[in-house]
Amino acid sequence: AIAPLLLVNNYSPDGLEPPTFNILSFVRVAPLLVVAVFVLALKEMASVGLLPVYGVRSGLTEATAALMLFFAAIGGAVLQFPIGWFGDYFSRVGVMVVCGLIGIAGAVVLPFVIMVPWLLFLTLFVWMGFFAGVYTITLTLAGQWFRGNELAIAIASFGVFWGLGGLAGPVIAGYAMDVWGPNGFPLMMGASATLLIVFCMVPRFRQAPRTAAVVRSTP
């Protein structure tokens, strides 16, 4: 990872305006994007670490519980294409809201289908696939709202807040499962999706930051 950087020789593109914010102030500049990245990282790392545990504690065999991750991952890969298409032709924040609503719906449905394998796998495919689409839309919004050095700072900020969400996810989900039993896992997932939707509903957060160059008019 370091080797290519040694060949760059401190190269910097010409003609770029200096950024008007840094990683810390990015929270104030684009809070919706920060929350979206944090929520998705929380969901991803909690799922990788605890989704099979949730399955076993709910009565599934270890083999079936392991398959839960497989179908969740397949959904996360396949459904990015239609989600990206919707993001090109419809309101991107609106698509993010739909992904969040499906995140809540999946959390509600999961405990009721846990013992029916085909329904469980279908639910995980759709639920995790659309929930993962939040990051697709977040990247698209970053490209729409920022240019040049500001885009570089935005993407770097994503890495920081992804790391924070990834650290918090297993801890919060594990605590929820200790307190409320196995269903603490979908409860945490639903709560995180709700937080995302709340931020999407705030008009100020739905608009391009004033410091950024707006590339397209689609909100």
Where are each of the predicted segments found?
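A late C-terminal transmembrane helix in Major Facilitator Superfamily
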Residues: G148-V179
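Structural signature of the two symmetry-related core transmembrane helices
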Residues: G94-V109, G190
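C-terminal membrane-cytosol helix-exit motif in multi-pass small-molecule transporters
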Residues: A1-G15, F199-R204
